[in-house]
Curated annotation (Swiss-Prot):
Its main location: cytoplasm. The gene is valS. Belongs to the class-I aminoacyl-tRNA synthetase family. ValS type 1 subfamily. Its EC number is 6.1.1.9. ATP binds at K537. Keywords: Aminoacyl-tRNA synthetase, ATP-binding, Coiled coil, Cytoplasm, Ligase, Nucleotide-binding, Protein biosynthesis. It comes from Nitratiruptor sp. (strain SB155-2). Residues 805-871 form a coiled coil. SUPFAM superfamilies: Anticodon-binding domain of a subclass of class I aminoacyl-tRNA synthetases (SSF47323), Nucleotidylyl transferase (SSF52374), tRNA-binding arm (SSF46589), ValRS/IleRS/LeuRS editing domain (SSF50677). This is Valine--tRNA ligase.
Length: 871
């Protein structure tokens, strides 16, 4: 083994990964020698081709890889299905910007030419995130990698759409939708709401046939050109006499009725509400209830149309200022007051979203009924379980899903129209030649594309061959894949896409295959900085996973994320944690170096007999660790599994096993075999260093030996309760002696004698003497007089004070006592001052009270020590 005192991950990570992938270990038959007939399937949430690996990705893929490596080593035929998403809006935006930088507008070159540019960009730049994933050490079946717009998945998308179309579950109609003037139609969950400081404009609407006017309050005065009624509550005494009359819209003089509706909140604004059915979702419903006209006042780009009179041709938000100015000039503004309200923004570009009536394609909400029913029957289990409640709450409010997007890049909606006879039909073919009804060739395809999430919703089964036709058969998927791997065993993803993606996969999977697509769904929380702040470029607290791998290693990053992944809690990631687990890799490396000083290579644990008591003790501790790690992984408690591994390898094996073996060198061969086996237990979390140390301790190299990743995962080792109790008592004695020595400033010195009261055998003396630095150990049955005492869990220890010069110790304690007494006096005076307690900030007062209590406790401890040493 290298003489270097630190492990160098850069020397092994890329080399090992290339060997693993080249040998096919990531494929479903990569572990065929140990397969037991069970299967395990997990889907990679397909990252966007525009994406770069961020820390949230690193968490998702680390947790997935831990489960995949665990199941693979445990004999399962394992499929981790990789792939990327075409990311409609994001990808089109990237390519549009590139072309604009060259002076090219997509409209000038047309759809087909533009799509050629997109495909070219995808081939050249769209796999950056896949390259970055390899640096993390993940092990999906790369040979099966899919792309949401590969030919097979295009076939599957058409299959799904056409079936839903003819079942009446996909329909087209004029709906009130969320409209981004940059990115087009958005589904409800693609709109992000932020509280904004705005204004509430009180506008005077003249009452027809009267000198009076009705005041309405609105946050969007530019939309009043689309008003078709003013609405009041029928129980509002202020306005009862006006119901049925009309008002005249300022500036444009169009008359609209005053109507009554119990939905009006009499407390909001003036209690009179403008009704704009074409530009407000609530007004849309009012318009339908009262048969009001629907007047659209701006186009797809947010430009006001002729309905706005002199303001036609002005962008909507710019028009707001001009409309208000004009209304003020004409005396139609009663007042403007500050008003906080929720404003919807496009999740992709940040534009203010407008409610807008537009002909769009929708998936009807009824498709979700069976999926919700089966989820609540337990067909899918959520981890943490409270996410089922969130799922149910969202599904109760589910509306029809708008799936059409006004883009060029994406799955083209497979609906065709005949200009000759007006026939409309959906087709599973990529191209149609003629109308099936009249035979005319004057046909055209719907220009819109599908929401990216539509193809993603098919991911758990389309990647397994469903609807693919023959494309990719025998390469990307095989005849029995769907039967073998559907439903998938597990999905791991962030909670933030539960509704974007997870719920929709459940709808589609249940509808087409009559089973929910996952047995278990694990939803992890957000990765935040060490202070719990969300990471953002503006805050300067972003932790880049690629930079982190470069500085700390992939293993350190993976283990840190796993150790912090408590179910239901956000992860607070810090450099201190990363350093801690980088130090862990060095601790493991140096443990192996120590073992190899005594013996160059070690047998497999299964091939040796453990004879020494120390070997039996460490094997028993290892057996308990195996049980805990397996139980925790099986219930997705990644943090608990990582904590167990860290505690066993550092706290038990390195801190005690190795140190105790310096007394009993006969145990080193046994400890080496246990340590080598423990690398298998750790491997799913830290694949690189475990491979390195496993090969080193085997006396070979990965070039000439099979990888650790296809070795059987450790099963329970024998646990000897009697041996464990014996060594726990020895360790307790050592720790107690060290504490007692520290009290008399002799922590690092050898002392002549210690008396121990407890259940210990003669063989324990050698261990205690060596590790506690004591010349003579004597077992006693009664407490000793004139001695420093420490009481442990199983023993009491006594260090006789005879012959020990206590003067320096007493001087130190008396100085500490004097200093603490002054501090207590000062704090007591401050807190007894009524003016201070009354006028100082409450937090400062509480801080001083806590400081006083702490100082008093420390003084009591020192006085106890002085009393003990001067008895």
């Amino acid at each position: 083994m290298s003489k270097a005192t630190k492990y160098d991950p850069k020397k092994v990570e890329r080399q090992f990964y290339q060997i693993w992938e080249t040998r096919g270990y990531f494929e479903t038959d990569g572990n065929k020698k140990i397969q037991n007939g069970k299967t395990f399937c997990i889907m990679m949430p397909p990252p966007n081709v525009t994406g770069r690996l961020h820390i949230g990705h690193a968490l998702t893929f680390t947790l997935q890889d831990i489960m995949v490596r665990y199941k693979r080593m445990d004999g399962y035929e394992t499929l981790w299905q990789p792939g990327t998403d075409h990311a409609g809006i994001a990808t089109q935006n990237v390519v549009e910007k590139q072309l604009l930088s060259k002076g090219i507008k997509k409209e000038e070159i047309g759809r087909e030419k533009f799509l050629e540019y997109v495909w070219k960009w995808k081939e050249e730049s769209g796999n950056a995130i896949v390259t970055q994933l390899r640096l993390l050490g993940v092990s999906p079946a790369w040979s099966r990698e899919r792309f949401t717009m590969d030919k097979g998945l295009k076939n599957a998308v058409r299959e799904a759409f056409v079936n839903l179309y003819y079942e009446g579950l996909i329909v087209k109609g004029n709906y009130m939708i969320n409209w981004c003037t940059h990115d087009g139609a958005l589904s409800d969950i693609e709109v992000e709401y932020e509280e904004k400081e705005g204004a509430l404009y009180h506008i005077k609407y003249p009452i027809v046939g009267s000198d009076e006017y009705l005041v309405v309050a609105t946050t969007r005065p530019e939309t009043y050109f689309g008003d078709t009624a003013v609405m009041v509550n029928p129980n509002d005494e202020r306005y009862k006499h006006l119901i049925g009359k009309k008002v005249r819209l300022p500036l444009i003089n169009r008359e609209i009725p005053i109507i009554a509706d119990e939905h009006v909140d009499m407390e909001f604004g003036t209690g009179a509400v403008k009704v704009t059915p074409a530009h407000d979702p609530n007004d849309y419903e009012v318009g339908k209830r009262h048969n009001l006209p629907f007047i659209t006042i701006f186009d797809e780009n947010g430009i006001l149309n002729e309905e706005a009179g002199e303001f036609a041709g002005i962008e909507r938000l710019e028009a707001r200022k001009k409309v208000v100015e004009k209304l003020e000039q004409e005396g139609f503004i009663e007042k403007i007051e500050p008003h906080k309200h929720q404003v919807g923004h496009c999740y992709r570009c940040g534009n203010v979203v407008e409610p807008y009536i537009s002909p769009q394609w929708f998936v009807k909400a009824e498709i979700a009924k069976e999926a919700v029913k089966k989820a609540n029957e337990g067909e899918t289990k959520f981890y943490p379980p409270q996410w089922l409640n969130n799922f149910n709450a969202w599904m109760r409010e589910l509306r029809d899903w708008c799936i059409s997007r006004q883009l060029w890049w994406g799955h083209r909606i497979p609906v065709w129209y005949c200009r000759a006879c007006g026939h409309e039909w959906a087709s599973k073919k990529e191209h149609e030649e003629s109308c099936p009804k009249c035979g005319s060739t004057d046909i055209y395809q719907d220009p819109d594309v599908l929401d990216t999430w539509f193809s993603s919703a098919l991911w758990p089964f389309s990647t397994l061959g469903w609807g693919n036709g023959d494309w990719g058969k025998g390469v990307k998927w095989f005849e029995d894949d769907l039967k073998k791997f559907y439903p998938n065993d597990l999905l791991i993803t962030g909670f933030d896409i539960l509704f974007f993606w997870v719920a929709r996969m459940m709808m589609m999977g249940e509808h087409f295959l009559h089973k929910l697509p996952f047995k278990d769904v694990y939803l992890h929380a957000l990765v935040r900085d060490e202070h719990g702040q969300k990471m953002s470029k503006s805050r300067g607290n972003v932790i880049d996973p690629i930079d982190t791998i470069e500085e700390y290693s992939a293993d350190a990053l993976r283990f840190t994320l796993a150790a912090l992944a408590v179910q239901g809690r956000d992860i607070r990631l810090s450099k201190e944690r990363l350093e801690l687990y980088r130090n862990f890799t060095n601790k493991l490396y140096n443990a192996a170096r120590f073992l190899q000083i005594h013996q160059e290579k070690f047998d497999d644990l299964q091939n040796i007999q453990i004879k020494t008591d120390l070997g039996k003790y460490i094997l028993s501790r290892f057996g308990l660790a195996i049980q805990e790690v397996r139980n925790n992984l099986n219930s997705y408690r990644f943090n608990d599994a990582a904590t167990t591994l860290y505690r066993f390898l550092w706290g038990e094996f390195c801190d005690w096993g190795i140190e105790l073996s310096k007394v009993n060198k006969d145990a080193i061969a046994e400890l080496g075999a246990i340590f080598k086996e423990s690398m298998k237990l750790l491997h799913p979390f830290m694949p690189f260093i475990t491979e390195f140390l496993y090969q080193e301790l085997s006396g070979t190299s990965i070039e000439e030996n099979e990888s650790i990743m296809i070795q059987p995962y450790p099963k329970a080792a024998p646990i000897d309760e009697e041996i464990m109790k014996r060594f726990e008592t020895i360790i307790d004695a050592i720790v107690s002696i060290r504490r007692a020595k520290a009290l008399i400033d002799m922590a690092n010195k050898t002392i002549p004698k210690v008396l121990i009261k407890g259940d210990l055998e003669e063989s324990a003396k050698a261990y205690i003497s060596k590790l506690a630095k004591v010349e003579t150990i004597e077992f006693v049955s009664e407490p000793a007089e004139n001695a420093v005492t420490d009481i442990g869990n199983y023993v009491e220890v006594f260090i006789p004070l005879e012959g020990i010069d206590l003067t320096p110790i007493l001087n130190r304690l008396n100085k500490q006592k004097e200093k603490l007494q002054k501090e207590i006096d000062k704090l007591s005076r401050m807190l007894s001052n009524e003016n201070f307690v009354k006028n100082a900030p409450q937090a400062v007062v509480e801080q001083n009270r806590a400081a006083l209590a702490e100082a008093q406790n420390r003084l009591a401890t020192i006085e106890e020590e002085l009393a003990r040493l001067t008895r």
